[in-house]
Amino acid sequence: MSVRLVLTKGREKSLLRRHPWVFSGAVARMEGKASLGETIDIVDHQGKWLARGAYSPASQIRARVWTFDKDETIDIAFFTRRLQQAQQWRDWLAKRDGLDSYRLIAGESDGMPGVTIDRFANFLVLQLLSAGAEYQRAALISALQTLYPECAIYDRSDVAVRKKEGMELTQGTVTGELPPALLPIEEHGMKLFVDIQGGHKTGYYLDQRDSRLATRQYVKDKRVLNCFSYTGGFAVSALMGGCSQVVSVDTSQEALDVAKQNVELNKLDLSKAEFVRDDVFKLLRKYRDQGEKFDVIVMDPPKFVENKSQLMGACRGYKDINMLAIQLLNPGGILLTFSCSGLMTTDLFQKLVADAAVDAGRDVQFIEQFRQAADHPVIATYPEGLYLKGFACRVM
């Protein structure tokens, strides 16, 4: 008999709506003992079966649902089916957009909670972010090897969130060859170097692909400021769009060096690209005090908020940085501003940008809205999957 997690009366409603999380406060008791990440059955207070998920005794999210099908077991065949379902959509996207790299598995939205898999050319980069995902590591890797024999698999589970569930950070080659220091990939007609071993996240921000493409329409003959530039995806896109100059700002010299190489890789005019190692907040104030002006500003900061207790401070940060950007824009200029913080709702982010415009003494029109690229889908029963939001704003 399998271990059962019994819910408190009335706490089954979210599972009946097929939300994939069970929080600790919803648990009445455990029947049997389960190890970290082990698959358990989830039942209501009367013993009615609801779902099958992974158990994490120390996490606020006490269980993450693998399946709502009582007849489905969590094994190699399960992961093979999930991967095949996900691949069908990515095949269509890759053909439509000319991609050789994409997010293959987007966690809960692809029915694999705690699992992130990005494909960069013939490398699969794996992140196992939950105890259940780690527990199923062998089955998942076996399914990947069967479906993708041409691909090497590299583990980037070196993410601090693993510590919250009592797991160590891991990184290294799983199967196949070691990724090169810089791997070239393609998106929307441009080539970009990706650092799988040492780069942010899995090596690159695939979720901003469509936003990078959208940037091109705003930059013809314009002076562009690219804040938090990382390895220069927005800068390359701006140059491909015909900008007169793009200034990329980041605190990492290594990232800026790769950004320069990305400009050269695409045979673009390097004289139109400037790379500045500096703190964005400080530099924006310096530019403001010096009277610098730009026609387009890309504001793509890292996550400012990890938990609800940080939300107030994050709001101040987002408002301040957007206020500074608005002050630096010429009349009619375009601000492309983003938030990747899941706790920051789209409505709240829009309000913060509007408040920033008031503080800057400028009128702003919202002219376009952005979200994560389509290889980062959001399943209807898990709205938390929508984490990236952005706006194109015309500053009067």
From Swiss-Prot:
Give the InterPro entries listed for this entry: PUA, PUA-like_sf, PUA_sf, RLMI, RlmI-like_PUA, SAM-dep_methyl-trfase, SAM-dependent_MTases_sf
Coiled coil (residue ranges): none
- Give me the reactions it catalyses: cytidine(1962) in 23S rRNA + S-adenosyl-L-methionine = 5-methylcytidine(1962) in 23S rRNA + S-adenosyl-L-homocysteine + H(+)
Q: What is its EC number?
A: 2.1.1.191
CC annotations in GO: cytoplasm
- UniProt similarity note: Belongs to the methyltransferase superfamily. RlmI family.
| Protein name, entry field | Ribosomal RNA large subunit methyltransferase I
